[in-house]
């Protein structure tokens, strides 16, 4: 090309300069430049490595260049006509590129740096997740250890309460002593530590039922012996009154009771005007007899409370004893001397006392032979069933067991529980003052709520 033609050739337009500047800015971005360089190197390496692919790519490049040249030649008039609009678009694109560079600083960094930073972020995130997982595992281990310690404390406290309130029986002590004689046998505490929670809980429940049964049976034996003692003294009193009415000197038994002691003391007193006053001794004897009957009445009440939940045959035995005591008490109510008590009443009373003595023996045999029933909770639940309202010293009793007040017992409302039970079974109506018209039959399996620490 000559110098004249070069001088006459038109220079690049303003749009081309702006367009070139925009393209240069985009191409000058480090991330774009590094990425394009990496792609170009990979493209060139692929062409050199595969000759056939290289020939095809060179042919495609030649075609694309021809098409681009022809497209630019045909689009040149249109681009010249739209030069102001394209300049405005270019300016807006430059402004958007400025904002994009501010929001995305990694555009000013090479691709290697961006990849390295991304790897660092991913590694940091993975490390954080691993740390959280380890921390969660550590928390779970600590929680498991805390729950295990809490279970140990609860079981140890329950076992201490059982050992304190229900001591070991003679059979258990003998079995424990026999086990201790064997080789390499640890103590009870060591054996409990090596047992699982469910094994310890099951053995504790079984032992609690057995000890509660033995404890209740022991209480029933005590009441039985006390009732028989009262019946024997009343039998001696009736025999003494019968002999005195017949004019026979009473015979002192081998083990004299209160009545015979009273008459021996009276016989040793000095004479008054050469005779003794029988009326005073008879009055004191009758008063003593009424006291024995009242004491026997309270013992029968305790027996009746203890046999709730047992078969009807056992309850009938206690009811027969109560009827005998009530009949004898009615006969002695207004008597002031022996003559006020009819001989027929004395004879019937002696027979009733003998039958009552036999009934008490049969009652204990029924309890021992029967399978332990809902009364296994022994002296706890029947008291709650019998009382229409909480006892006045309930808080003191609870504090004595657990060592302090506890809000868990704020919901214990015996009248409300009784009314709910009546409404559920549809038996009886409740009068004003929360007093039932008829005493409802207690549930067949009353639940002990006085000592929640022993509820399993």
Swiss-Prot record:
Q: Which modifications occur after translation, per UniProt?
A: Phosphorylated by PKA. Phosphorylated on serine in skeletal muscle at rest or upon lipolytic stimulation.
Give a GO molecular function annotation for the protein.
identical protein binding
GO process annotations (BP) = lipid droplet organization; lipid storage; mitochondrion localization; negative regulation of fatty acid beta-oxidation; negative regulation of lipase activity; negative regulation of peroxisome proliferator activated receptor signaling pathway; negative regulation of reactive oxygen species metabolic process; negative regulation of triglyceride catabolic process
Q: Which Gene3D superfamilies match?
A: Flagellar protein FliS, Perilipin, alpha-beta domain
Major localization class = other
Protein role: Lipid droplet-associated protein that maintains the balance between lipogenesis and lipolysis and also regulates fatty acid oxidation in oxidative tissues. Recruits mitochondria to the surface of lipid droplets and is involved in lipid droplet homeostasis by regulating both the storage of fatty acids in the form of triglycerides and the release of fatty acids for mitochondrial fatty acid oxidation. In lipid droplet triacylglycerol hydrolysis, plays a role as a scaffolding protein for three major key lipolytic players: ABHD5, PNPLA2 and LIPE.
Assembly description: Homooligomer. Interacts with PNPLA2; prevents interaction of PNPLA2 with ABHD5. Interacts with ABHD5; targets ABHD5 to lipid droplets and promotes interaction of ABHD5 with PNPLA2. Interacts with LIPE.
Question: What is the name of this protein?
Answer: Perilipin-5
Q: Which organism's genome codes for this protein?
A: Bos taurus
| Gene behind the chain | PLIN5
């Amino acid at each position: 090309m000559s110098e004249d033609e070069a001088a006459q050739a038109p220079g690049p337009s303003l749009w081309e300069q702006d367009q070139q500047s925009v393209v240069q800015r985009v191409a000058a971005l480090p991330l774009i430049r590094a990425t394009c360089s990496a792609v170009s190197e990979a493209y060139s390496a692929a062409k050199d490595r595969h000759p056939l692919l290289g020939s095809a790519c060179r042919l495609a490049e030649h075609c694309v260049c021809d098409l681009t040249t022809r497209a630019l030649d045909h689009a040149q008039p249109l681009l010249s006509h739209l030069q102001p609009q394209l300049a405005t678009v270019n300016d807006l694109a430059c402004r958007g590129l400025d904002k994009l560079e501010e929001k995305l600083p990694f555009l000013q960094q090479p691709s290697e740096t961006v990849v390295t930073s991304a790897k660092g972020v991913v590694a940091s995130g993975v490390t954080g997740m691993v740390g959280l997982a380890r921390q969660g595992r550590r928390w779970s281990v600590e929680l498991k250890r805390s729950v295990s310690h809490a279970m140990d404390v609860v079981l140890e406290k329950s076992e201490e309460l059982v050992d304190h309130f229900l001591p070991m029986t003679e059979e258990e002590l003998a079995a424990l002593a026999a086990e201790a004689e064997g080789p390499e046998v640890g103590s009870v505490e060591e054996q409990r530590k090596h047992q699982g929670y469910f094994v310890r809980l099951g053995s504790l429940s079984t032992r609690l039922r057995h000890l509660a049964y033995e404890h209740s049976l022991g209480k029933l034996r005590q009441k039985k012996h006390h009732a028989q003692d009262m019946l024997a003294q009343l039998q001696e009193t009736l025999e003494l009154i019968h002999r005195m009415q017949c004019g026979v000197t009473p015979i002192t038994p081998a083990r004299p009771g209160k009545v015979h002691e009273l008459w021996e003391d009276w016989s040793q007193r000095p004479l008054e005007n050469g005779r003794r006053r029988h009326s005073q001794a008879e009055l004191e004897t009758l008063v003593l007899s009424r006291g024995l009957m009242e004491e026997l009445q309270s013992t029968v009440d305790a027996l009746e409370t203890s046999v709730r939940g047992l078969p009807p045959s056992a309850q009938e035995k206690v009811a027969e004893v109560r009827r005998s005591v009530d009949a004898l008490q009615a006969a002695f109510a207004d008597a002031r001397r022996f003559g006020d008590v009819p001989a027929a009443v004395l004879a019937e009373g002696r027979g009733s006392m003998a039958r009552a003595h036999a009934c008490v023996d049969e009652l204990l045999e029924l309890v021992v032979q029967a399978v332990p029933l809902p009364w296994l909770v022994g002296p706890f639940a029947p008291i709650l069933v019998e009382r229409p309202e909480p006892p006045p010293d309930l808080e003191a009793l609870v504090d004595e067991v657990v060592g302090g007040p506890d809000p868990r017992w704020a919901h214990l409302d015996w009248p409300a529980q009784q009314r709910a039970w009546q409404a559920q079974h549809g038996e009886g109506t409740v009068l004003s003052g929360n007093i039932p018209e008829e005493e409802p039959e207690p549930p067949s399996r009353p639940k002990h709520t006085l000592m929640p620490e022993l509820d399993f």
